């Protein structure tokens, strides 16, 4: 079968071609393609009947290749944001994915998205025992980096920017009911100072303390865990001399250094068994001509009792505040 259409904006689907086959073992699409005047999509997939019945041995695979051309981006915008289109790269946005395996082990060989000379994002990893809540596990690694992202500025009137060389790396992990994520945001000037700065933290390796050991400047790092069975969570955030002005060039917020720790159990904050503990420190906050430092805060909740405290001790002020309720 072939299907074509033309939308009022001028977006035109010029061809569609595909084939579906099935037997007692598999449903498969050996070929499916869609094309517009500037873009294309290619899909191949296999799904075992066992997978649909949540059995572990059924085959599961998919390959996707897609490109969205600048011409179609212009048609979707309908002539708006002409400055954005003038600075948008004359290259297609590319998306590629390749996954293969079964419910015992699903391997994400490739997940890529990017715009040439602008940015790229990549992910890969394995997921294990997906139907077993106690044995499931796996790791997904993520990496993203920016290059020339100036074409975004017209969309936000210059209020938001991503400087060339800004990067994000991360790892997502599963171990039974526990999930973990470790994200590292680096500005172009970031440099590792200790081994911990580059050591991955996962649900398998949580003995290090970000708030005490992470020292990389011009960087921010988030580590978090969540237990699906207990609704228990833990998170650490460390920000070291992160220049917020690089992201918000029209704002007056510059260097920020701070750390935050949170842990707890339960998501119903009206239940007596729900508890959480939060503590943090602001070591540096540069706003306009003000350079603030020396702020500590804590908050705890347990058995319907909330306690919060703020301590500010620096050259400009000395303040203590407390809330009990």
Model-derived segments and their meaning:
Residues 2-325:
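Interface amphipathic segments
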């Amino acid at each position: 079968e072939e299907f074509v259409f033309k939308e009022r904006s001028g977006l035109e689907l010029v061809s569609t071609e595909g084939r579906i086959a099935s037997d007692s073992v598999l449903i498969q699409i050996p070929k499916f393609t869609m094309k517009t005047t500037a873009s294309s999509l290619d899909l191949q997939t296999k799904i075992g009947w066992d997978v649909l019945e949540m059995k572990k041995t059924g085959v599961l695979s998919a390959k996707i290749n897609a490109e969205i051309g600048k011409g179609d981006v212009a048609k979707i915008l309908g002539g708006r944001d002409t400055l954005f289109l003038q600075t948008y790269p004359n290259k297609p946005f590319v998306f590629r994915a390749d996954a293969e395996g079964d419910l015992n082990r699903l391997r994400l060989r490739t997940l890529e998205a990017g715009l040439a000379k602008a940015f790229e994002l990549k992910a890969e990893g394995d997921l294990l025992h997906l139907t077993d809540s106690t044995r499931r596990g796996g790791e997904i690694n993520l990496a993203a980096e920016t290059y020339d992202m100036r074409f975004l500025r017209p969309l936000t009137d210059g209020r938001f920017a991503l400087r060339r060389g800004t990067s994000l790396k991360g790892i997502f992990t599963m171990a039974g009911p526990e999930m973990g994520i470790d994200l590292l945001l680096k500005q172009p000037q970031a440099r590792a100072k200790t081994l911990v700065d580059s050591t991955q933290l996962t649900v398998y390796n949580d003995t290090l303390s970000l708030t005490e050991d992470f020292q990389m400047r011009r960087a921010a790092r988030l580590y978090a865990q969540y237990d699906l069975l207990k609704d228990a969570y833990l998170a650490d955030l460390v920000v070291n001399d992160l220049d917020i002005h690089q992201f918000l060039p029209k704002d007056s917020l510059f260097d920020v250094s701070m750390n935050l720790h949170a842990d707890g159990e339960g998501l119903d904050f009206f239940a007596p068994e729900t508890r959480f503990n939060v503590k943090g420190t602001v070591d540096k906050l540069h706003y306009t001509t003000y350079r603030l430092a020396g702020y500590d805060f804590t908050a705890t909740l347990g058995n319907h009792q909330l306690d919060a405290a703020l301590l500010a001790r620096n050259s400009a002020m000395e303040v203590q505040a407390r809330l009990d309720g």
